[in-house]
Amino acid sequence: MTGRFIVLEGIDGCGKTTQIQHLLEWLPNSGLMPKGAAVVCTREPGGTPLGRSIRELLLHTSDQEAPAPTAELMLYAADRAQHVETLIRPALERGDWVISDRFSGSTLAYQGYGRGLDRDLIQRLEQIATAGLQPDITLWLRLSVQESLQRRLGDKEDRIEAEGAAFLERVAQGFAQLAEHRSWCAVAADQSASAVRAALERQLQEHLA
C-alpha cells in the first residue's frame, strides 16, 4: 500500500501552518484515507534531526556568517535529500499520508526566482535530492506581497523573511509560474480562514478521492 504526499506552498504569511493544523484533524475523518493509515506532518527545511541543524544554518539572523546563495541552495538540497530518504518515502511506503509545509517548489521560487540562481541547476538538484519523488497534490496558497507584509508586521523575521518586498515579489512571481507549469491547485489565501479550509478540503476531495 502506498500513501499520499500532500504539499502546501506559498509566500510567507499565507497561512500554511494554520491550514496544515486543520488538515491534520480533518483528513483522518474525511473518508479519503484507508483504514490504518496515519497522517505524518513535516516541513522544509527541518523535517528531520539533521534537517533541523540545516534549518538553523539557513534561517538564523545572528551576526554569524550567512550562507552564500549557492551554498544556501546546496543546504536546501541536502535537507531535502535527507527528508525524502529518511522520513517521506518510508512513511509513504508504510501507507501513511504525508503533509509537508514546503517542498521543492519553494526552492525554485525562493532561490531560482528570488535569488536569481540558475533554474536548470536547481531542477537538476531537485531530481537528485528527491530521487524522482513528487507530491500527489500541491496546494498553493496564493497571497499578494502587500497582504503578506501586512500580516507579518511586527513579527520576528528569519533571514529569508527579512529580504524585503522586492525579493518577495520575485518569489511570488515564481510561485505563480510554477503553479501554472506544474498544475498546482491554487487557493486564494486572502479569504477568511474558514473559507480557505473549505477550499482546501474541496481540492483534496476532488483530486485524492
Swiss-Prot record:
Signal peptide: none annotated. It catalyses: dTMP + ATP = dTDP + ADP. Its EC number is 2.7.4.9. CDD domains: TMPK. GO terms for biological process: dTDP biosynthetic process; dTTP biosynthetic process; dUDP biosynthetic process. ATP binds at residues 10-17. One of its GO terms (cellular component) is cytosol. It holds the Pfam family Thymidylate_kin. Belongs to the thymidylate kinase family. It comes from Synechococcus sp. (strain CC9605). InterPro entries: P-loop_NTPase, Thymidylate_kin-like_dom, Thymidylate_kin_CS, Thymidylate_kinase. It comes from the Bacteria. Keywords: ATP-binding, Kinase, Nucleotide biosynthesis, Nucleotide-binding, Transferase. Phosphorylation of dTMP to form dTDP in both de novo and salvage pathways of dTTP synthesis. GO terms for molecular function: ATP binding; dTMP kinase activity. This is Thymidylate kinase.
